[in-house]
């Protein structure tokens, strides 16, 4: 997605733009995206072109380290898809405790770790206390 594309998307009636800035669906690996893979300057230029007419979402952010997530937010992204980040902690509870834990207790344990991880990412992304 280029800054020049923005008006075409907005004129089509979108509410949220999910630009491609080098992000991809799928796994980046434990280190997150490679150095130089994400084009923050392009994201900033897209944000400037949008000029608050629509919001910016990013797909393919699951393996972003905290500092990458924060830089994307500073560059204009307001919605980051983090499903895998939250499911991983819940799935770890399943792997570790499912063979020996009653289902109701297992669900409670999952909910607790997912809530804590959600709160941690809300702090990282600067969204805690905003709703």
Regions found by a protein language model. Give the residues of each.
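Alpha/beta enzyme core
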Residues: 1-52, 66-82, 88-92, 123, ...
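Conserved short-loop catalytic and cofactor-binding motifs
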Residues: 30-34, 60, 105-109
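A short, structure-level motif marking secondary-structure boundaries and short turns
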Residues: 53-54, 103
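Glycine-rich beta-to-alpha transition loops that act as phosphate-gripper elements at the mouths
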Residues: 55-66
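Extended, intrinsically disordered, low-complexity segments
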Residues: 95-131
């Amino acid at each position: 997605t280029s800054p020049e594309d923005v008006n075409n998307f907005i004129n089509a009636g979108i509410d949220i733009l999910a630009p491609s800035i080098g992000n991809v669906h799928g796994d980046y690996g434990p280190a997150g995206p490679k150095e130089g893979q994400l084009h923050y300057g392009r994201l900033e230029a897209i944000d400037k072109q949008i000029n608050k007419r629509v919001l910016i979402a990013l797909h393919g952010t699951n393996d972003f380290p905290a500092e990458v997530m924060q830089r994307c937010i500073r560059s204009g992204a307001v919605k980051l898809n983090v499903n895998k980040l939250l499911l991983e902690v819940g799935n770890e509870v399943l792997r570790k405790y499912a063979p020996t834990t009653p289902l109701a207790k297992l669900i409670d344990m999952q909910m607790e770790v997912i809530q804590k991880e959600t709160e941690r990412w809300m702090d990282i992304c600067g969204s805690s206390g905003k709703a």
